[in-house]
Design a protein with these regions (language model features):
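Insoluble glucan recognition modules
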Residues: 1-203
Length: 203
């Protein structure tokens, strides 16, 4: 590379990632952006351009994503895509069940896998990530776990493409509702006792 004596001006523009990402489909709003059934995906905390959600999906039912709640910027995949098929321009899964969807716009990845939601903390048996005893189990279209001790309820969704700590995909139960951490601060939590059953209705 040869430079002459003239001044060379270089402008570097940062890529701006959207602050929101939505999922629409046969089961998520019926392809109507005005529907309350459209899913607003949860940001992975402090991870620019990353979003996640866990829902119950039926086999062969189409869905896709958009950074706006409208058509025009919708997509079914990025550079690296796995865990799902594409049919007629829409994503589909092969079997009914709960799935974790993790979209990383920065790394250009869309990853879908069977959902693994784990409890974390004393009421779930400890603070080690991925404990089999702390895994929520499907019961029809809800997920359930029984507390093995007293303590605060904390939960998180595992992801095979995660590049951040478990709490960046955390959720809790507060006032009978599932509350997602997203990009917010550490959450107010509820204390529960051994033997109580926690039921998550994610749809």
């Amino acid at each position: 590379v040869v430079f002459n004596s003239k001044t060379l001006a270089v402008t570097i523009s940062a890529v701006a990632f959207p602050e929101s990402l939505y999922m629409i489909g046969d089961e998520f709003g019926g392809w109507d952006w005005k529907s309350d059934g459209v899913v607003e995906m949860t940001p992975v905390s402090k991870q620019e351009g990353q979003f996640w959600n866990v829902r119950y999906f039926s086999a062969k039912k189409g869905f896709k994503y958009s950074p706006i709640r409208d058509w025009g910027k919708d997509f079914h995949g990025l550079k690296t895509n796995d865990g799902y098929a594409v049919d007629g321009g829409n994503c589909t899964v092969e079997a009914d069940g709960f799935y974790m969807v993790h979209v990383d716009l920065k790394r250009e990845m869309v990853h879908v896998e069977p959902a693994r939601i784990y409890g974390m903390g004393d009421c779930f048996g400890g603070w080690d990530a991925g404990m089999e005893a702390a895994l929520f189990k499907a019961d029809g279209k809800v997920l359930k776990a029984t507390l093995v001790g007293d303590g605060e309820i904390r939960m998180y969704a595992e992801s095979s493409i995660a590049n951040s700590d478990w709490w960046t995909r955390e959720c809790i139960v507060l006032d009978g509702k599932i509350v997602y951490r997203g990009n917010g601060d550490d959450q107010k939590r509820v204390n529960c006792t051994k033997g109580q059953e926690v039921t998550l209705d994610l749809n």
